[in-house]
C-alpha cells in the first residue's frame, strides 16, 4: 500500500515517452519514423493502459481505506520563499485518473483508424499523448501552482488539437477563439491563486483549506476580498468547462478531429473545470454567496445549452451544446453542495458522451466518402437520414448513448441525472422546475439528432437533384486527398424538383419536410440503382458504409460502460449488501444536502422520483418523434394536424413565436453577434490605436532623434570640412542673415 502511494508520482509521466520519441524520431530520422507511423499507436495505448491499471489499484486502496496520501518535495530558494511540488492521492484523483485513462485508451484505438488517411498522423498522436499527460498531471497535483502549470498545458494541447487542421481558416479561427476565451478565465484563476496565497500564506491544498477555514471561523479576513478571490478562482472553471458567459468557444471547437471532440468533451478539458470546482469545494463551501453564484451559473448554462441545441444542423455542434448543458448540471450540483451527485454525473456523462461523439465520427467518416472532406456537408444532419440499414452497429450504439443522455433506465446517465434532479428539489423549487424542464428538452434535441441521422431516407441524393447543384463538384480536403464526384447535367427529375427540401432544420414547421420526400421515394427507388432510364451510363449513387472493426470496437466497449457504469453509484443497501461503490470511495464526502443520510434509498421514493423524471424524458422523445419520425407523417396526410392547427386561435402569432425561438437558437442566442459588436469591435479599435501609438509615438521619438542627429552631423561635417569655399559660403550666409534681421 505504502509503496503504491509512493510510486504514484510517476503517473503523469508514464505516457510522456511517446511524444518525446516521436519528436526525436521526426527530428533525426524523419523518413523511418514516418514509414512506421502506424506502429506508434501501440506504445501509446500500452503506456496509458499501465496508468489505468495503476489508477484502478489506487481506487481499490481508496475504497478499502478511504485514506488521503500527500507527498511533497520542498525546493527552498531562500529563508522566506520555497516552492513545493508533490502529488495528492485521494478519491477524486482516483476517479479522474480512471476516467482519463479508460476514455483515452478507447479514443487512441479509435483514432488509429479514423486518422489513418491523414498526413499528420504522427503529430496527432503526439498531441493526444501529451494531452493525456497534462490532464493526469492536473488531477494528481497537490497545490495550486502545479494545478495552474498543468492547467495551462491542458489549454495549450486543446489549442493545438482544435486547430489541428490549421490550413482551414475556420479551424485556425476556432482554436484562437478557444485560446483567447480561456485566457480570460485563466487570468482570473491566476489572480485568485495569488489572492489566496496572500490570505493564507500557503498553496498546498491541505494547509490552504485548514488555514482558510480557521480564518473564516475567527472572522479574521475581509469577507468581500475573500469572496472576490473565490470568484476569480471559479472564473477559471467557467471558461474551461464552457459555462455561461465564457461558453462561446465550445461549438467552434468542433473544427478539430472528432476523436479529439470525444476526448475534450468526456474526460479532459471540460472535465478539468468540474475537477477544479470539486477540488476547491472546501474553500467555496464556507462562502454562501459563492455557492449560490455557482448554482446560478450552473442553472443558466443548463437552460442555455439545451435551448441552443434544438435548431443546430451540425451534428457535432449539437452534441457540443449538449455537453455544455450537462456540465451545467454538474456545476449546479456542486453549487447546491451535492458533491457525490456531481461526480457521479461526471462519470456517467463521460462514457455516454464519448460514445455519442465516436458514433458521430463513424457517421461523418462514412458520409465523407459521398460528400467529400467538407465539414459543412459531412456533418450536416440535413444531408443524412436513413442510415439505419447502412450502419446498423453505429445506429444501435448511438441509440444507446442517446437513451442514456435522455435519462432512460437502465442506462448510466439515468442514475446520475435523477440524483441531481432530486437534490434540486431540496435546494430550490424554482431551480428544480427549470432543471426538470431542461431534462425534457434534452430528450427532445437528442432524439432530434437520432431521427434526422438514422430515420427516413438519405437526403444527400435529393440535394443533388434539387436543381441548384446539377454540375460537377469537388470534395477538396486541405488535410487529405482530393476526390472528384461527377454528376451529369443531363439528369432532370421534375418530381424531385418540386419537392420542398429546405436545408433549414427547425424543430417545428421550418424543418426539412422529410415525410414529403418519403412519400415519393418508393416510386423512384429504382433511380438509385439504375440510371439507364435517363440515357446516362455509369451513373450510380453511393451510400454510407459501416465503419471498420477498429472504430466499432471502441464504440462497443463504450456501450458496455454506458450499460454498467451507473451501477457504481446505485444507492441501494439491502440486508447487508451495499452496492454504492461511489459513496464508499468518497468517504469522507462533502455533501450538504445529505449530511445525515446513510446513502440508501427506499424503493417507494426511488420509483416515485424515477417515474417523474422518466416521464419527462419520454414526453420530450414523443415530441421529437412527432415532428421528425417519418411514421408520423401519416397524421399530416390525414389532415389531423391541419384540423388541430385550425382550431388554434392566433395561429399567426404562434408561428411568429416559433420563428423567434428558432432564429434565437440557430443563431446561438445572438451571444456571438453581441460580443462581436460590443466587445470584439472595441478591442480591435483599441488594438489599432495601440499599434499606431507604438509605431508612431513610442518608436517615432527615438527614430526621430536618430534621424535628426544624422542630418545635424551631416550639416556640421560640411561646416568644418576644411574647404575655403564652404567657410566663405557660410560666412556670407550668416552675414546676410544678420543684416536682414537688423535692417528689416
Swiss-Prot record:
Quaternary data: NDH is composed of at least 16 different subunits, 5 of which are encoded in the nucleus.
Protein family membership: Belongs to the complex I subunit 5 family.
Main location: plastid
Reaction(s) the record says it catalyses: a plastoquinone + NADH + (n+1) H(+)(in) = a plastoquinol + NAD(+) + n H(+)(out); a plastoquinone + NADPH + (n+1) H(+)(in) = a plastoquinol + NADP(+) + n H(+)(out)
Membrane topology, record value: Multi-pass membrane protein
GO BP, sorted A to Z: ATP synthesis coupled electron transport; electron transport coupled proton transport
Superkingdom to which the source organism belongs: Eukaryota
Bilayer-crossing regions: 9-29, 40-60, 89-109, 125-145, 147-167, 185-205, 219-239, 258-278, 280-300, 327-347, 354-374, 396-416, 425-445, 552-572, 612-632, 724-744
Gene: ndhF
Annotated protein name in UniProt: NAD(P)H-quinone oxidoreductase subunit 5, chloroplastic
Localization: Plastid, Chloroplast thylakoid membrane
Cellular component per GO, a single term: chloroplast thylakoid membrane
Entry keyword set: Chloroplast, Membrane, NAD, NADP, Plastid, Plastoquinone, Quinone, Thylakoid, Translocase, Transmembrane, Transmembrane helix, Transport
Organism: Cicer arietinum
EC number per UniProt: 7.1.1.-
Pfam families: Proton_antipo_C, Proton_antipo_M, Proton_antipo_N
GO MF assignments: NADH dehydrogenase (ubiquinone) activity; quinone binding
Enzyme class: translocase
Role: NDH shuttles electrons from NAD(P)H:plastoquinone, via FMN and iron-sulfur (Fe-S) centers, to quinones in the photosynthetic chain and possibly in a chloroplast respiratory chain. The immediate electron acceptor for the enzyme in this species is believed to be plastoquinone. Couples the redox reaction to proton translocation, and thus conserves the redox energy in a proton gradient.
Amino acid at each position: 500500500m505504502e509503496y503504491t502511494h509512493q510510486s504514484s508520482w510517476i503517473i503523469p509521466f508514464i505516457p510522456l515517452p511517446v511524444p518525446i520519441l516521436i519528436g526525436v524520431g521526426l527530428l533525426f530520422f524523419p523518413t523511418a519514423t514516418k514509414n512506421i507511423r502506424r506502429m506508434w499507436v501501440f506504445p501509446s495505448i500500452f503506456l496509458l493502459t499501465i496508468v489505468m491499471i495503476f489508477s484502478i489499484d489506487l481506487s481499490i486502496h481508496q475504497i478499502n481505506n478511504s485514506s488521503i496520501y500527500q507527498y511533497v518535495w520542498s525546493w527552498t530558494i531562500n529563508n522566506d520563499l520555497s516552492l513545493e511540488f508533490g502529488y495528492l492521492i485521494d478519491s477524486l484523483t482516483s476517479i479522474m485518473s480512471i476516467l482519463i485513462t479508460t476514455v483515452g485508451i478507447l479514443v487512441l484505438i479509435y483514432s488509429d483508424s479514423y486518422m489513418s488517411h491523414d498526413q499528420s498522423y504522427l503529430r496527432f498522436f503526439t498531441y493526444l499523448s501529451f494531452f493525456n499527460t497534462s490532464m493526469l498531471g492536473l488531477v494528481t497535483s497537490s497545490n495550486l501552482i502545479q494545478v495552474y502549470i498543468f492547467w495551462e498545458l491542458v489549454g495549450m494541447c486543446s489549442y493545438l488539437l482544435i486547430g489541428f487542421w490549421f490550413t482551414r481558416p475556420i479551424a485556425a479561427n476556432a482554436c484562437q477563439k478557444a485560446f483567447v476565451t480561456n485566457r480570460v478565465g485563466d487570468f482570473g484563476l491566476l489572480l485568485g491563486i495569488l489572492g489566496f496565497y496572500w490570505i493564507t500564506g500557503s498553496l498546498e491544498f491541505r494547509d490552504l483549506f485548514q488555514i482558510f477555514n480557521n480564518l473564516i471561523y475567527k472572522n479574521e479576513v475581509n469577507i468581500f476580498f475573500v469572496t472576490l478571490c473565490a470568484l476569480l478562482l471559479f472564473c477559471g472553471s467557467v471558461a474551461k468547462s464552457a459555462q455561461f458567459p465564457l461558453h462561446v468557444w465550445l461549438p467552434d471547437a468542433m473544427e478539430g478531429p472528432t476523436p479529439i471532440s470525444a476526448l475534450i468533451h468526456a474526460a479532459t478539458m471540460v472535465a478539468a473545470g468540474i475537477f477544479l470546482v470539486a477540488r476547491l469545494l472546501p474553500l467555496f463551501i464556507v462562502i454562501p454567496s459563492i455557492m449560490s453564484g455557482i448554482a446560478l451559473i450552473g442553472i443558466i448554462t443548463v437552460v442555455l445549452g439545451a435551448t441552443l441545441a434544438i435548431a443546430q444542423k451540425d451534428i457535432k455542434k449539437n452534441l457540443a451544446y449538449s455537453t455544455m448543458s450537462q456540465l451545467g448540471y454538474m456545476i449546479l450540483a456542486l453549487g447546491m453542495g451535492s458533491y457525490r451527485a456531481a461526480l457521479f454525473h461526471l462519470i456517467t456523462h463521460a462514457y455516454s458522451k464519448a460514445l455519442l461523439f465516436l458514433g458521430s465520427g463513424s457517421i461523418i467518416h462514412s458520409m465523407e466518402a459521398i460528400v467529400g472532406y467538407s465539414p459543412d456537408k459531412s456533418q450536416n444532419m440535413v444531408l443524412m437520414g436513413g442510415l439505419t440499414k447502412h450502419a446498423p452497429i453505429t445506429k444501435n450504439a448511438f441509440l444507446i448513448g442517446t437513451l442514456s443522455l435522455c435519462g432512460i433506465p437502465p442506462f448510466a446517465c439515468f442514475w446520475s441525472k435523477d440524483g441531481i434532479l432530486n437534490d434540486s428539489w431540496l435546494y430550490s423549487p424554482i431551480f428544480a422546475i427549470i432543471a426538470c424542464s431542461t431534462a425534457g428538452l434534452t430528450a427532445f434535441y437528442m432524439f432530434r439528432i437520432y431521427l434526422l441521422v438514422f430515420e427516413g431516407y438519405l437526403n444527400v441524393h435529393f440535394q443533388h437533384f434539387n436543381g441548384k447543384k446539377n454540375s460537377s463538384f469537388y470534395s477538396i480536403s486541405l488535410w487529405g486527398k482530393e476526390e472528384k464526384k461527377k454528376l451529369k447535367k443531363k439528369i432532370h427529375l421534375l418530381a424531385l424538383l418540386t419537392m420542398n427540401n429546405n436545408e433549414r432544420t427547425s424543430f417545428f414547421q421550418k424543418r426539412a419536410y422529410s415525410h414529403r420526400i418519403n412519400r415519393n421515394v418508393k416510386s423512384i427507388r429504382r433511380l438509385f440503382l439504375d440510371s439507364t432510364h435517363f440515357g446516362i451510363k455509369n451513373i450510380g449513387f453511393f451510400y454510407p458504409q459501416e465503419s471498420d472493426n477498429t472504430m466499432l470496437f471502441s464504440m462497443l466497449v463504450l456501450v458496455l460502460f454506458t450499460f454498467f457504469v451507473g451501477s457504481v453509484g446505485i444507492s441501494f443497501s439491502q440486508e447487508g449488501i451495499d452496492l454504492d461503490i461511489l459513496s464508499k470511495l468518497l468517504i469522507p464526502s462533502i455533501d450538504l444536502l445529505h449530511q445525515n443520510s446513510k446513502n440508501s434509498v427506499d424503493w417507494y421514493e426511488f420509483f416515485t422520483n424515477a417515474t417523474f423524471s422518466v416521464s419527462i424524458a419520454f414526453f420530450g422523445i414523443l415530441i421529437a418523434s412527432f415532428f421528425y419520425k417519418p411514421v408520423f407523417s401519416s397524421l399530416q396526410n390525414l389532415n389531423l394536424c391541419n384540423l388541430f392547427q385550425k382550431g388554434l386561435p392566433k395561429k399567426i402569432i404562434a408561428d411568429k413565436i416559433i420563428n423567434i425561438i428558432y432564429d434565437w437558437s440557430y443563431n446561438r442566442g445572438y451571444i456571438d453577434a453581441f460580443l462581436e459588436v460590443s466587445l470584439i469591435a472595441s478591442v480591435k479599435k483599441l488594438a489599432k490605436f495601440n499599434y499606431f501609438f507604438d509605431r508612431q509615438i513610442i518608436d517615432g521619438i527615438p527614430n526621430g532623434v536618430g534621424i535628426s542627429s544624422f542630418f545635424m552631423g551631416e550639416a556640421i561635417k560640411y561646416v568644418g570640412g576644411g574647404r575655403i569655399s564652404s567657410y566663405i559660403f557660410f560666412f556670407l550666409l550668416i552675414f546676410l542673415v544678420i543684416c536682414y534681421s537688423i535692417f528689416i
